[in-house]
């Protein structure tokens, strides 16, 4: 039996090994073991691995080891899809170079003031980490000179493609000097990413790491079919009976995050909203409060939650089901980190069962249904908490003055048990310890395509035209938007408004056709009513969309298809399919990232309970 390989065996310099040792790690993860020697030897690397595999250290350790601190210009560039990931990578790099005198790291992302970034660049940062949009802005402004760059890393390349940043990535790559080393990491390898590897990489060494199910996050998943009570009441019930440290609740819209937060605060939960309207400073303050325990719940949209990596989160509630299955996977990945177990709860409206089936199909496993906690469950939970509260108070030794008060009460010729019961009634506050029975509810009718012991003919899904993967057709509805060419609108404006306001992956937006006074757009069937109401108020170029339903799309051929390049192919001559730039300048970073932590080296170094790297 061969001995385990350690970081000391990989050829890393002493100052890097010392930093790694300080972090408490000895054994490299599979991707680190494979990539580090290649990058130290000057080879380009194409890494295919899921998040949580330790790829940040896989590229950062060998490349940082080769930085020359005496050269005060950018030598290493890391592009990440979100500002959260960029910050995490930069933080990790800071830890890795703690013993490298003179190595400076700067982070460039939208939402942060330019003067802060300019000051860091002028101080001679050798390592630049940022989002594609802000990096390209600095290049065009002449404030970022990459003429002497030695290393470039594309982290989460498929995410940058999915978010529409691939054009910016290629533009930046074209600016680099001829002799540089490239490392590209991606969980999947769609054709546009392959194209980049062929165009910009020199005989890359491919490293493929399979997910180790033994190290997969321990997440207990369940769903509740919305029935009998409103989601708000159900949410309060579930939160009351769930045993969680911290929780994140996902809503589909910014307005939803505010409404849910207001509901929770009124009912005694320490909560805060997290959405795209927040400044970066306020966002970071909110996440810091969640980390240090002064906040227990954040209510977030998918966009705002990207990049959250907080060990305390042990519960994820999908208040609104995501319209694409991949978003669900990334949502629940916020819990079950660092070897801890987690819970994920999904609310499913009657019209959303198809979306649930899509999620189960992607995950290759079913999600068990859970019953709404009834009055007996709530009552028992409240009583246990109340008894625990009283027991804890009895441990204090400063109760003597209250004993004298009891003596006064007992001499009032009142039964002691009645006095104690009256005290309990006063102490219970708003959360009553004795609850009336729930009103009877009609039994939920199981539909033909509902869950359980259904046996579905495989051809039935084909007849429904459901989407089986990227680029496959799915049932669509046609909508009209009261904004058109005369208003100066372009397809990218429509896509951006729908994708950002509804947190909808742009690939799930169908054929868009522009007319002079209005626009038609195809969206997946089963869109929640609340979301459509939100779209009606959404503004495009400062004009309300006033979205209205026209009917179901009758033929798949009438609908555009999409490829991984984000380009739409439709029959209408008025349809312009370029999707490469459907975003605002300063919000590029506020996108999607999910770093699942495992017991090897997760991408965000931790300071506790480490056994391996």
Curated annotation (Swiss-Prot):
It comes from Haemophilus influenzae (strain ATCC 51907 / DSM 11121 / KW20 / Rd). A motif (DEAD box) lies at residues 155-158. One of its GO terms (cellular component) is cytosol. One of its GO terms (molecular function) is ATP hydrolysis activity. HAMAP family: DEAD_helicase_DeaD (MF_00964). A motif (Q motif) lies at residues 5-33. The gene is deaD. Residues 440-469, 556-613 have a biased composition (Basic and acidic residues). Keywords: ATP-binding, Cytoplasm, Helicase, Hydrolase, Nucleotide-binding, RNA-binding, Stress response. This is ATP-dependent RNA helicase DeaD.
């Amino acid at each position: 039996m061969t001995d385990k390989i350690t970081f000391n065996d990989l050829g890393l310099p002493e100052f890097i090994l010392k930093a790694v040792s300080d972090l408490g790690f000895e054994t490299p993860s599979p991707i680190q073991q494979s990539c580090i020697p290649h990058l130290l030897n000057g080879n380009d690397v194409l890494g295919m691995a899921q998040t949580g595999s330790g790829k940040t250290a896989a590229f950062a350790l060998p490349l940082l080891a080769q930085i020359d601190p005496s050269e005060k210009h950018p030598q290493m560039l890391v592009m990440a899809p979100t500002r959260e990931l960029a910050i995490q990578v930069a933080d990790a790099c800071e830890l890795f170079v703690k013993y490298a005198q003179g190595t400076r790291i700067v982070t460039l992302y939208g939402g942060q003031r330019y003067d802060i970034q300019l000051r860091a660049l002028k101080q001679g940062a050798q390592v630049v980490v940022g989002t594609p949009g802000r990096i390209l802005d600095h290049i065009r402004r002449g404030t970022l000179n990459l003429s002497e760059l030695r290393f470039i890393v594309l982290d989460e390349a498929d995410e940058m493609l999915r978010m529409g940043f691939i054009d910016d990535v290629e533009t930046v790559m074209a600016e680099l000097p001829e002799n540089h080393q490239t490392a590209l990491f991606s969980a999947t390898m769609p054709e546009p990413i392959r194209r980049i590897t062929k165009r910009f990489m020199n005989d890359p060494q491919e490293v493929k790491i399979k997910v180790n199910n033994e190290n997969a996050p321990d997440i207990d998943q369940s769903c509740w079919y919305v029935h009998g009570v409103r989601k708000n009441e159900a949410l309060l019930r579930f939160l009351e009976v769930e045993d969680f440290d911290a929780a994140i609740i996902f809503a589909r819209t910014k307005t939803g995050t505010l409404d849910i937060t207001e509901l929770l605060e009124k009912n005694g939960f320490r909560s805060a909203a997290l959405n795209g309207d927040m400044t970066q400073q306020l966002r970071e303050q909110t996440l810091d409060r969640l980390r240090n325990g002064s906040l227990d719940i954040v209510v977030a949209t998918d966009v705002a939650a990207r990049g959250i990596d907080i060990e305390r989160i042990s519960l994820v509630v999908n208040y609104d089901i995501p319209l694409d299955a991949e978003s669900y996977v990334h949502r629940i990945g916020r819990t079950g980190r660092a070897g801890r177990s987690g819970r994920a709860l999904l609310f499913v409206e009657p019209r959303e069962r198809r979306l649930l089936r899509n999620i189960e199909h992607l995950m290759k496993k079913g999600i068990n249904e859970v019953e709404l906690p009834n009055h007996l469950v709530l009552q028992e939970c409240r009583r246990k908490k109340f008894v625990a509260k009283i027991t804890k108070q009895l441990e204090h030794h400063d109760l003597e003055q209250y004993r004298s008060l009891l003596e006064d009460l007992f001499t009032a010729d009142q039964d002691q048990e009645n006095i104690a019961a009256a005290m309990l009634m006063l102490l219970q506050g708003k959360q009553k310890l004795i609850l009336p029975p729930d009103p009877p509810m009609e039994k939920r009718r199981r539909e033909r395509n509902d869950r359980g012991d259904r046996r579905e003919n495989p051809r039935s899904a084909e007849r429904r035209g459901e989407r089986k993967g990227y680029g496959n057709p799915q049932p669509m509805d046609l909508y009209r938007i009261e904004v058109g060419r005369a208003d100066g609108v372009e397809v990218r404006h429509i896509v951006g408004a729908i994708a950002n306001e509804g947190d909808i992956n742009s690939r799930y937006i169908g054929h868009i056709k522009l007319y002079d006074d209005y626009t038609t757009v195809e969206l997946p069937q089963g869109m929640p009513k609340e979301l459509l109401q939100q779209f009606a108020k959404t503004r495009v170029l400062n004009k309300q969309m006033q979205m209205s339903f026209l009917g179901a799309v009758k033929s798949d051929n009438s609908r555009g298809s999409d490829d991984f390049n984000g380009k739409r192919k439709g029959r209408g001559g008025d349809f312009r399919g370029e999707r490469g730039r459907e975003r605002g300048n300063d919000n590029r970073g506020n996108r999607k990232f999910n770093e699942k932590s495992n017991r090897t080296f997760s991408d965000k170094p931790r300071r506790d309970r480490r056994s391996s790297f």
